[in-house]
Swiss-Prot record:
Subcellular location: Cytoplasm
Sorted UniProt keywords: Chaperone, Cytoplasm, GTP-binding, Nickel insertion, Nucleotide-binding
Source species taxonomy: Bacteria, Pseudomonadati, Pseudomonadota, Betaproteobacteria, Burkholderiales
Binding site for GTP: G17, P18, V19, G20, S21, G22, K23, T24
Family: Belongs to the SIMIBI class G3E GTPase family. UreG subfamily.
Pfam hit, one: cobW
UniProt-recorded name of the protein: Urease accessory protein UreG
Entry's Gene Ontology cellular component terms: cytoplasm
GO MF annotation terms: GTP binding; GTPase activity; nickel cation binding
Keyword Nucleotide-binding annotated: yes
Domain of life the protein comes from: Bacteria
């Protein structure tokens, strides 16, 4: 199988999803799990603040200089799709500073089910929804659910507390996504995290990450 080498551009992974779905937590957990094996940098998007950058820095997901915050100043989906120039510029700046990067993670601001990443900006897209948002979320569809490369149905541990039926959610997810991959998990506790990592490395032509001891 072909693998990505330093001769290839870094893999750009877009992470999107509604506010509160767990995008930043997923990004934190990915960085902490993968940073010993891959050269990582992160770009976060917020409308008027750099709160997600701050959260990742406080959590020590990566060294502060490897986390860049972007203030979009408007609809967050515009900055990742219709006019991605502010993010493309941020990627260029980060890669000038870290030319050996293997992966650039780009986290969108909280957006809706219609948001998607521009193919100019992202090689792979991961869309995060959460069980607490309601059992009906998967069947609402939208490009994030139907067209993302990987769908993460997060916070499955909360299902008993919010009256959500995981079997129904999974069946709806399968129906809406046809044969596209998805993960049912709770990334804060680590459930499903390895599946996300394996998806990134396999689809991104990166060497597989060693199993955790």
């Amino acid at each position: 199988m072909n693998t990505r080498t330093k001769k290839l551009p870094p893999l750009r992974v877009g992470i999107g999803g509604p506010v509160g779905s767990g995008k930043t937590t997923l990004l934190e957990m990915l960085c902490k799990a993968m940073r010993a094996h891959y050269d990582l940098v992160v770009i976060t998007n917020d409308i008027y603040t750099k709160e997600d950058q701050r959260l990742l820095t406080v959590a020590e997901a990566l060294p502060p200089e490897r986390i860049m915050g972007v203030e979009t100043g408007g609809c967050p989906h515009t900055a990742i799709r219709e006019d991605a120039s502010i993010n493309l510029e941020a990627v260029d700046r980060m890669l000038r500073q870290f030319p050996e990067a293997d992966i650039v993670f780009i986290e969108s601001g909280g957006d809706n089910l219609a948001a998607t990443f521009s193919p100019e900006l992202s090689d792979l897209t991961i869309y995060v929804i959460d069980v607490a948002g309601g059992e009906k979320i998967p069947r609402k569809g939208g490009p994030g659910i139907t067209k993302s490369d990987l769908l993460v149905v997060n916070k499955t541990d909360l299902a008993p507390y919010v009256g959500a039926n995981l079997s129904i959610m999974e069946a709806d997810t399968q129906r809406m996504r046809a044969h596209k991959p998805y993960v049912m998990g709770s990334v804060k506790s680590g459930k499903g995290l390895r599946e996300v990592i394996d998806f990134i490395t396999e689809r991104g032509l990166l060497p597989p990450m060693p199993a955790q001891g």
